[in-house]
A protein has these predicted regions:
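Negatively charged, low-complexity tracts enriched in Asp/Glu with abundant Ser/Thr
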Residues: 1-19
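Generic beta-strand structural signal
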Residues: 19-20, 29
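Short strand-coil-strand connectors
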Residues: 21-23, 46
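Short, surface-exposed, low-complexity cationic segments
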Residues: 29-49
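Mixed-charge, Lys/Arg-enriched low-complexity segments
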Residues: 49-74
Length: 74
């Protein structure tokens, strides 16, 4: 998996799920009450909202690692 793959998934709003060290992580999407869309990423049922692909790549973590650093291993 590459950053381009994740970018493509986000553009299509395609959900993605993977297991890392026995924990399930998700990438999906949500809207707030005003209609603003968010990317949701994190452990299953504990996802955090990110405003954009850039925000996700700069801040999303899997345990003590940035998500972007683990992509090639997925």
């Amino acid at each position: 998996m590459t950053k381009d793959d994740i970018y493509f998934y986000i553009q299509l709003k395609k959900e993605f799920e993977f297991v890392f060290k026995g924990k399930t992580y998700i990438l999906n999407y949500d809207k707030d009450d005003s209609g603003k869309e968010f990317i949701v990423f994190g452990q299953l049922y504990e996802g955090k909202r990110f405003e954009s692909y850039g925000d996700l790549m700069n801040h999303a973590k899997v345990e003590n690692h940035f998500f972007r650093e683990l992509l090639e291993d997925l």
